Amino acid sequence: RMLYGFEVSVILIVLRQILEDFDSNPTESQASYKYVTATEIKEEAELFLPTTFNRAKFEKDLDRYIDSIVSFGFLVEAKHAEGEKRYKIHRIIKEKVTLDDLLEFKNKLNDYDAADESL
C-alpha cells in the first residue's frame, strides 16, 4: 500500500469526486472517459489546500503534485487543449479512492468547518 502526501491525497480525492460526478451525470454518460485540464484540477484542489503567500511557488507545487499523480497512473496525459495540458482520469482511481474515502473526507471537512465556526 503506497502512502501519499497530504496534497497529493487531496488532489486524488478531488479527481475521484470529479469522476463520480461525471459517472452520475446522465448527459455525460455517452462519453466513457473524463478529461480535465490542469487548470480545472488546480481550481478544485485550491479549495482544500492552504495557499501560500508566494502564488508562483504554489502553482509550481500543484504542477509537481499533478505530475506525481500522472506517474502513479491515476492521470494519463492527453493532447493539449489550446496550449494547456489535458488529462484523462484513469478509472483505477476508483479502486484506490473509494466512495467511503470520499464520504470520510467530506465528514472531516464538515467537522473542521464546525470547529472553525465555534472559535
Question: Where do the protein language model's features map onto the residues?
Answer:
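Short basic alpha-helical hairpin corresponding to helix-turn-helix/winged-helix-like nucleic-acid-binding
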Residues: 1-34
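Short, amphipathic alpha-helical interaction segments positioned at domain boundaries
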Residues: 2, 91-119
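Residues in the recognition helix of alpha-helical DNA-binding motifs
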Residues: 65, 89-92
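A short, conserved structural fragment
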Residues: 66, 70-81
